[in-house]
């Protein structure tokens, strides 16, 4: 990371990978001066998005091996034909059902709550709070030590209608959220 920022004369490096949630403690330890943002949104909507991505990448990969090979090569195994659950101790094993992805959301964020809450260099970012809240945006800029009054008008994401969600999973994910 230091070589990349040095080479391009940049102060910041952005790594967007859904599986970074698993690595947040490690990343924080090897980059103690870093600022880590952890974006999250309504858990059922986020899980729905992951399921849709999983289905999309499976479909794309049927006709193009490069997609699967490339995603595997760069370590993106959070959906698609190379999918590996973030946590394997699960109740819902059918990757094509929403409950599986909600359970993965719960296991991912539940595991990380203490780490997130006990590190001053980690800031969770709630998508729903970001929409229409200039004050919340300024909090993020302040955390990142960015001196700017620029405001990006974040748009509300389309809500997917949800069917067949395990009520206990739903309750648990919203408690964490």
Language-model-detected regions and their locations in the chain:
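A structural signal for short coil/turn segments at secondary-structure junctions
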Residues: 8, 31, 119-120
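N-terminal cationic-hydrophobic initiation segments that often serve targeting/anchoring roles
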Residues: 5, 28, 116-117
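Conserved phosphate-donor/acceptor-positioning beta-strand/loop module used by diverse small-molecule
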Residues: 16-18, 27-52
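Active-site phosphate/pyrophosphate- and oxyanion-stabilizing loops and adjacent acidic/basic residues
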Residues: 25-26, 138
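PAPS-dependent sulfation machinery
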Residues: 1-14, 78-87
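Short catalytic-loop micro-motif centered on adjacent basic/acidic residues
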Residues: 12-16, 124-126
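PAPS-dependent sulfotransferases, especially Golgi type II membrane carbohydrate sulfotransferases
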Residues: 51, 58-177
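Amphipathic coiled-coil/heptad-repeat helices and related helical stalk/stem segments
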Residues: 20-23, 108
């Amino acid at each position: 990371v230091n070589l990349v920022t040095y080479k391009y004369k940049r102060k910041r490096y952005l790594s967007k990978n859904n599986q970074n949630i698993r690595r947040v403690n490690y990343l924080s330890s090897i980059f103690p001066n870093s600022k880590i943002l952890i974006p999250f949104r309504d858990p059922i909507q986020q899980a729905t998005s992951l399921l849709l991505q999983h289905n999309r990448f499976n479909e794309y990969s049927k006709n193009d091996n490069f997609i699967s090979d490339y995603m595997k090569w760069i370590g993106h195994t959070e959906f698609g034909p190379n999918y590996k659950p973030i946590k394997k101790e699960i109740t819902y094993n059918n990757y094509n059902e929403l409950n599986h992805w909600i359970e993965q959301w719960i296991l991912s964020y539940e595991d990380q709550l203490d780490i997130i809450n006990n590190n001053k260099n980690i800031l969770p970012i709630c998508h729903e709070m970001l929409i229409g809240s200039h004050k919340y945006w300024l909090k993020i800029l302040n955390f990142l030590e960015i001196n700017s009054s620029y405001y990006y008008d974040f748009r509300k994401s389309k809500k997917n209608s949800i069917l067949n969600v395990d009520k206990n999973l739903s309750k648990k994910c919203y408690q964490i959220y």
